[in-house]
Amino acid sequence: MDDLTAQALKDFTARYCDAWHEEHKSWPLSEELYGVPSPCIISTTEDAIYWQPQPFTGEQNVNAVERAFDIVIQPTIHTFYTTQFAGDMHAQFGDIKLTLLQTWSEDDFRRVQENLIGHLVTQKRLKLPPTLFIATLEEELEVISVCNLSGEVCKETLGTRKRTHLASNLAEFLNQLKPLL
């Protein structure tokens, strides 16, 4: 496990939860995750859940993605998706508003790996360098990804070579995120 990335993710999650507490006097609330089982759920309302991050309990790797492509995935990606269970968190990096993706449960972790595999299949078919997404943007065809060759974080337009460098590594990126509520 990449300790710098794990700590940066935990630190951002704490900043996010602290901001939520400050603004709403509660743990983060999600309507989107209502009815979806997770160890993160601490209480349920009529149409939403309150959540708090929990330690990841499964195998701490995305080996299914590695096996599917017979490639080695950046250690930071293993760490990013296996440090904790949490809800997705809205954030800002510079002037970019994003949703930082998280694994919600062990079932969700399997789905995330399947989506990463699908993303890599498309990139391979289009002969694009491999990236692994970590966040979504309002623009549907743009994501924040980690380049699997260099470990750099970039804003990527899906299906194209258009990439904008954002940070030299995932820990640096996470450390610069500001929570958005």
From Swiss-Prot:
The identity of this protein, by name, is Protein Syd
In its UniProt entry, the species of origin is given as Escherichia coli O81 (strain ED1a)
List each coiled-coil range.
Answer: none
Record carries keyword Cell inner membrane? yes
TM regions (residue ranges): none
In this record, what's one Pfam family? Answer: Syd
Q: Where in the cell is it found?
A: Cell inner membrane
Q: Which UniProt keywords apply?
A: Cell inner membrane, Cell membrane, Membrane
Question: What does the similarity note say?
Answer: Belongs to the Syd family.
> Which CDD domains has this protein been placed in?
Syd
| UniProt function note | Interacts with the SecY protein in vivo. May bind preferentially to an uncomplexed state of SecY, thus functioning either as a chelating agent for excess SecY in the cell or as a regulatory factor that negatively controls the translocase function.
Keyword Membrane recorded = yes
Its membrane topology is listed as:
Peripheral membrane protein
- At the top level of its lineage, which domain of life is listed? Bacteria
Q: Name one GO cellular component term.
A: cytoplasmic side of plasma membrane
Extract the InterPro entries matched here.
Syd, Syd_sf
Q: What is its main location?
A: membrane
